[in-house]
Amino acid sequence: MGFGKIVETSPFDHDSIIAYTSQLAHVVSSAYVKSPTMQKELGFSAGSFKDMTRVATLNETMWTTLFMSNRDCLVFEIDELIKHLTEYRDAIADNNSDTLEQLLKDGRILKEEEI
């Protein structure tokens, strides 16, 4: 299948991890492409745009079933993302470059530690 190793976990931990590592990305991608700016992206987009939109091309029937069967974990992750996006939004709206830079730094460090 291409997976590097088998991991044993509880059903709840599995569902929580899948909500975060897979399902949330599909929700975010689907929501992201709904921006009215999407119609104007031609000629301006590159790798980041392609990365963000790749999984928006999905089987909506299958993913609806998967999302609904894991709704508690997925709603938790969506709420977490909204909380963090609000922090970024507020820093930008308030013209608070120090807070924004710290938020970006925190994200970079978390990603680097994960690798």
Q: Model-predicted segments: where are they?
A:
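A structural signal for well-ordered alpha-helices, especially hydrophobic packing surfaces
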Residues: V28, L85, R89, K111-I115
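Interdomain hinge/lid region at the active-site interface
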Residues: M38-G107
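Alpha-helical scaffold segments in carbohydrate-active enzymes
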Residues: Q23, D106, L110-E113
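Internal alpha-helical scaffold of NAD(P)-dependent oxidoreductase catalytic cores
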Residues: M1-R54
